[in-house]
């Protein structure tokens, strides 16, 4: 099964701040989509991310403070259903490194290509949010094609 993989490094932040941006409703709404409902700070919780007429619901599978967040997609686009999204944090020199993986796609369809690019854009929004205090969550994100 194909996966989407990205690596970004962030300066002037801490693993704790990155973890909070990945595991709180407020943090997630500052870099992914401003229309975020629910809580993501405990295992088993669900959170819904709205993107206009589309939505994605995830369940938090694992939380390891300042180190790892793992989600499972429970509702949303058919291609996303049952996939898992992992964020692994580590510190290297004066960077917090984020290793991102959106795994278990059934096939490398056109939508996966689109989502790979959009994940890169949203991860850059996360980096911007943590380094400057202002991200570019949906609907302020960069548009890349006719699907958004």
Short names for language-model regions:
Residues 29-75:
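Glycine-rich portal/gate segments that line the openings of hydrophobic small-molecule binding cavities
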Residues 1, 53, 78-80:
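Glycine-centered tight beta-turn/hairpin loop motif at sheet-sheet or coil-to-beta transitions
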Residues 76-121, 126-128, 137-139:
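Beta-strand/loop substructures that line and gate deep hydrophobic ligand-binding cavities in soluble
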Residues 128-148:
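Short, highly charged C-terminal tails/helix-capping segments
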Residues 1-38:
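Hydrophobic ligand-binding cavity/cleft-lining segments
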């Amino acid at each position: 099964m194909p996966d989407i993989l990205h690596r970004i490094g962030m300066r002037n932040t801490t693993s704790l701040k990155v973890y909070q941006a990945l595991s709180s409703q407020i943090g997630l709404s500052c870099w992914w989509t401003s229309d975020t409902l629910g809580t993501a700070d405990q295992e088993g919780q669900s959170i819904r991310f709205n993107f206009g007429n589309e939505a994605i619901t995830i369940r938090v599978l694992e939380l390891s403070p300042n180190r790892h967040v793992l989600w499972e997609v429970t509702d949303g686009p058919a291609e996303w259903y049952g996939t898992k999204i992992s964020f692994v944090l580590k510190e290297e020199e004066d960077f917090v490194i984020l290793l991102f993986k959106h795994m278990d796609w059934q096939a490398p369809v056109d939508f996966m290509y689109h989502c790979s690019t959009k994940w890169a854009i949203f991860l850059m929004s996360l980096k911007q949010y943590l380094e400057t205090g202002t991200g570019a969550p949906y609907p302020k994100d960069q548009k890349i094609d006719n699907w958004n």
